[in-house]
């Protein structure tokens, strides 16, 4: 396994660990989720370029589109929660209340 793949897998694991450790703040969770998506994008792009499989060149673009949609929805949710409650602590929110 080349060293670049090890570094990207380490970046994914670090972002996943950050997601598990800092899950009380919504902004930290969103940043860790973006880090995971970025490392998945880079790893899938490198894998496809190394395999030279021309039919799957659209897979990294599709992953990038999903990451952009996830970021937009996450930021909209963060703005909504911040406007309604004044903070982004997930543990203090009861989203089931009207």
From Swiss-Prot:
The chain crosses the membrane at residues 2-22, 29-49, 61-81. It is a multi-pass membrane protein. Its main location: mitochondrion. GO terms for molecular function: NADH dehydrogenase (ubiquinone) activity. It catalyses: a ubiquinone + NADH + 5 H(+)(in) = a ubiquinol + NAD(+) + 4 H(+)(out). It holds the Pfam family Oxidored_q2. Core subunit of the mitochondrial membrane respiratory chain NADH dehydrogenase (Complex I) which catalyzes electron transfer from NADH through the respiratory chain, using ubiquinone as an electron acceptor. Part of the enzyme membrane arm which is embedded in the lipid bilayer and involved in proton translocation. This is NADH-ubiquinone oxidoreductase chain 4L. It comes from Microcebus simmonsi (Simmons's mouse lemur). The gene is MT-ND4L.
